[in-house]
């Protein structure tokens, strides 16, 4: 397994990882696995506009709704982004909802923490 983040003690090895791969190594054990191609078709449509970024992201954008499936190529995960939603929480779950709240055992709703929100809006790419 590659060393995550700091390379102290590994000065003679080229094992530092960063960005999406770093986040995936830290957090992906709590992420749901999902089919990237099905999500692209569902949210970005059959003919999405595809762009890539300098940071290793491939973006599939619906030309009408502007909703994007953002694939982190190195991290092997994706998120679903809706630019029409204002504020910080503009990523969607697999049902197309902003998962701001969770339902407790007693049936009441409670707001999610940032960590919980990130956990339910990151999806490991099903291979």
Residue ranges of model-derived segments:
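Low-complexity, glycine/serine/proline-rich disordered segments
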Residues: 1-59, 73, 77-127
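Charged, amphipathic alpha-helical segments
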Residues: 59-69
């Amino acid at each position: 397994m590659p060393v995550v983040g700091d390379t102290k003690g590994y000065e003679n090895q080229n094992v530092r990882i960063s960005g999406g791969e770093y986040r995936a190594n830290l957090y992906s054990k709590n992420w749901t696995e999902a089919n990237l191609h099905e999500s692209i078709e569902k949210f970005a449509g059959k003919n999405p506009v595809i762009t890539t970024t300098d940071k290793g992201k491939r973006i599939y954008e619906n030309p009408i709704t502007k909703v994007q499936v953002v694939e982190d190529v190195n991290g092997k995960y994706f998120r679903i982004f809706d630019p029409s939603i204002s504020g910080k929480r503009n990523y969607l779950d697999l049902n197309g909802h902003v998962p701001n709240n969770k339902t407790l055992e007693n049936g009441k709703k409670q707001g999610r923490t940032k960590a919980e929100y990130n956990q339910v809006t990151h999806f490991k790419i099903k291979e």
